[in-house]
Amino acid sequence: MSRVQRLELIVFIATFFAFAYFHQGGGWNQNSRFAEVRAIVEQGRFAIDDFIIYQRDAGGGELHRIPTRAAEYEIGGQHHRLAWVDMAWTLYPINESPAAEGVKLAPMIELCSSGDLGYVPHTGHFHPNKPPGTSFLGVPAYFIAYHVERALGMNPDAWWTLTLNAWITTIGSIGLISALACVLFFRLAREFAGGALFPAAAATLAFAFGTTFFPFATLFFDHAATGSLLLAAFYFVRRKSAGALLLAGACAGLAAITNYLAAVPVAFLAAYALLARLDGTASKADFRRTAIYLAGVLPFLILICWYNAVNFGSPTRLANDFQSPLFKDTGAFLGMFVLPSSYVAGLITVSPYRGIFFLSPVLIMGAWSLVAWLADKSRATEARLCLAIFGFFFLVNISFNGYHGGFSAGPRYLVPGLPFLALPLVVAFARWRWLTGALALVSVANQLLLTATDAQNPLAVGGHARNDRRQDFSNNLVGEYAWPLFAYGRAWPMLDQLLGVHLEKEEAKLEEAGVESDERERRIGEMRRDLHEGMVRGEASPFLLGAIEGPVSVNPIGYFEGMLEFRHYPPHSHETRWNSFNVGEFIWPGSRWSLLPLLLVSGGLCGWVLVASRRQAS
């Protein structure tokens, strides 16, 4: 094994260990995808009707699933029909056909493990309102886990088995693909650095651990996988062999059925295959290379058309066409897209709420270096491609009505484009090493805090962690949520804001009732003390955020529930505490010390890579 190959192996081990280290718990996005994985493996079908409602046995026993048929289910002899819910809590029956007498409407978002669902009326089946690529990627790992557990007599619906299986599925799909992508990033970075190892290694580690790619490499979402597959397509399309070009097309095609938006970068890569000069000769269209690349894309186009026809009745119908009306804006293109917003552009670039350059300041140098690439004739083609891919995802984000991305540790819709903004960092680490290194350290610290506490950061989105009197721009994911939870065990900045708003309302009620000012002050003081003491104890009322307890792995939601309401298990129970976890917590549960193995293994290996690559340069 050569020195470079050893470095690549160490990069893979360091990143895979880190991405596999965290289980981030449940949430709408990953719960719906995992339901499809289970349906494929356990039932051999795509419909997830039997994997969206979980109940506990009478007397507080194990979990069991409640099957649905045409959006209806039965509990204790009572028939219920699931209903969409709008912001005014109006119920709209999902199945609009006449209901039998005595059937009660039930709000879907309270009962189902996810609200990210689509219901197909002509089949009576539920599906995730997502592209299927992520689910397909998760099938191999879950297939192995499920059949091993079945041979051992384990119940896949048991809380701990379900939780572990979701973790294993995430590791064997998103975690693995993301780590492999880091190796390919390292190879591309070496090419763009002229073979220099240190700038390439530093850029790779800054990308892996200092950008929003890190937390999303630990989640069963599509974003890190899409970015990884597009990066892999870019790597292979730069090779000359027909096999590599086919593989480039396959990676691109898989990216497109993992995130439909990736179809546009797939076209950009086709243009690159057609026009790029890989051997330094004069530019001319290479239709052979492009045809081979597109031949690799074709099977995935056929696959998605077949999937859509089977599940939705037409190759051109998508799951989004059948999702909740809550996600649709009647005045928007495709129900989701509006004119680009300069305010959102500011939010996702420089704000402490979703700002890519605030949360990952090292990418400031990536953007600056991309400009330098554009001025360099030898790199101009690649620079234009990187700019086009990242710029496309940026444009989509600032035009999307759900720009914030829900519960998220950063601008998640930019994650698929991050590899292409980070690749130019090889220039920054070569020319401005100390400045870029300092910004990288700040970036890694931010991303580690966000990943170690909750990669699905709910600040300013979740009703339990939102102050409606504040603009999005003034919210701070790290300063108001991740850091206070890690350092003090509670998100005190937001809790204090919620307490202040609550007491203002209570004081207004007292004043309206004619209570004298001195008495109002006394009562409000007592109320403030009692409520603060309740938050210290972790009580969930009146502030649900008070039940969110640090310092690490704070998400109490499981893969069997869709909302933070502790319907299955009470706050601070063993189950809610272990719905999310990191590997170190098997030794130091609920402790900052749980990060020590991560710092020693991944941190030590990263240090070794940097030192070894610097020695090679010397």
Predicted feature locations:
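Start-transfer (signal-anchor) and selected internal transmembrane alpha helices
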Residues: 1-19, 170, 180, 286-296, ...
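Signature aromatic-anchored transmembrane alpha helix within multi-pass, membrane-resident enzymes
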Residues: 5-12, 294-298, 302, 379-391, ...
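Transmembrane-helix signature of polytopic, membrane-embedded enzymes
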Residues: 6-10, 150-160, 180-209, 227-228, ...
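Membrane-interface alpha helices of multi-pass inner-membrane proteins
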Residues: 37, 203-204, 208, 236, ...
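Membrane-lumen/periplasm interface segments of multi-pass, membrane-embedded glycan/lipid transferases
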Residues: 102-123, 285-287, 305, 309-373, ...
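Membrane-interface transmembrane helices that cradle and orient dolichyl/undecaprenyl
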Residues: 193, 223, 233-246, 277-281
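Perimembrane helix-loop-helix junctions
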Residues: 236-239, 264-302, 367-378, 423
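Hydrophobic, aromatic-rich transmembrane alpha-helices
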Residues: 357-380, 384, 421-427, 433-441, ...
